[in-house]
Amino acid sequence: MKPTCLRLLRSIAAFATLAWSVCSGAAQEAAKPPVPSGNVTFSFWGIASSPWQVMINDFQKTYPNLKVKWTKYSVDEIKQALRVASAAGKMGDAWFNWGGSLAAPYDDAGHSLELTPQLQAEYGVDKNIVPAALELAKHNGKLYGVPIWVRPMTIFYKKSIFDKYGLTAPKTFDELEKVCETLKSKGIIPVANGGKFSWMTMRTTDFFVEHFAGPAMHDKLFALEASYNSPEVIKAFTKLKEWVTKGYFNEGFISLDPAQALPLLQQDKAAMIFQGPWIEDQNIIPAKEDPNNYVPIIAPADQTPVRVSGFQEQVQFWTKAKPDEQKAALLFASFMTTPEVAQRNIAAFGSPSAVVGVQPPEGHPIAAQMAKWLQGEVKLYLPTDQALPQELVNAFFQAQDSVVLGTLTPEAACAQIQKAVDAFKATKK
């Protein structure tokens, strides 16, 4: 994970330059992947709130003999389901996953099918996915999944609230804090947060680490080559506690489901949130709201290179699936990532896409803005829950939440994380 993490992070820069600058006409002839004969049903595990049904319907219309049995999970449920299934030795035929340390255990244990160069060519993966996006999904130099989306995460603000109070988008960290102070004085929650499960709070914590430690040290922390018990990280955790004390988050956020955070903006109770482009298709447009009222900004970490948090999302395949089920699952991923299929479904399926030449649809200003950033203005760093080994993610979450609750000081929390890092590294010697 450690050298892989750094390589993945470096590959993001290349992906940012290429992903939306390559036109669909540059794609080579589509591959002709094998189609199972007879009636075949394969299982697919995916996030319930993601628009998989759009592609399932298109796929099943194109291949009437093939059926997708979609089992729906929440974000945290699918993580648990994969852990349980891998321990039992019985996975789905295909499943949605993230990358980094969230996918590595299944790759290392032999559950995830390696997509060899031959398989990549057979299913058009090498032609239809931007090459650098494939690098993002690789683990130890090998590919174990087909990238579907790339997801930057950053600060969004509600324009109508900012306009009401004469506020402008903050471009520096100091400006951000002044905006928070003003909003708080007006009775508006500055930043909506759903702290249950810890990963939404992590987005803010990661932002603070990026600000105080800088990109180079942040990457070294992920690689376990720098100490979490350092002045820079302590400052980040101190800032987290300060924001809690000042009431910059909604009261009781530590127990709020992340899904309940965005409604605080929709109800004009909060003005900002750390989120990703998926809210455009999954929340804002379905609510018949104007997506132009929810504006993503580059989270002002005051660092060079300019970075925000982000990750890729992929489909993986079970090595022990029956041959026809495995072929059907691979064909499903190949179908979804065919440029013409991806482009005609982009409005409903969501963006930014990892497919060559696929542009965000009209009427999607959030995706369009992020696509523009990723052409070179903004680079990405992995979120902690993908960058660190999963054994250490829990230690990070526990320390972070303890600071929020006031049961640990920032100094003690950082020392606790580093103690876990040292113990983990000792087991790898």
Predicted regions and their residues:
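Hinge/lid segment of periplasmic solute-binding proteins
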Residues: 29-33, 100-153, 177, 203-206, ...
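Short, well-ordered beta-strand elements
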Residues: 36-48, 66-71, 93-94, 144, ...
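Extracytoplasmic/periplasmic solute-binding protein
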Residues: 139-140, 144-148, 153, 177-226, ...
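Long, aromatic- and glycine/proline-rich binding clefts that accommodate carbohydrate-like moieties
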Residues: 36, 132-135, 294-298, 346-398, ...
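Extracytoplasmic/periplasmic substrate-recognition and gating elements
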Residues: 61-62, 88, 165, 246, ...
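Extracytoplasmic "Venus flytrap"/periplasmic binding protein-like
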Residues: 57-129, 138, 160-171, 264, ...
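Glycine-centered hinge/linker elements that transmit conformational signals in sensory
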Residues: 182, 222-253
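A structural signal for short loop-to-beta-strand junctions that line the ligand-binding cleft
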Residues: 85, 92-93, 123-161, 189-192, ...
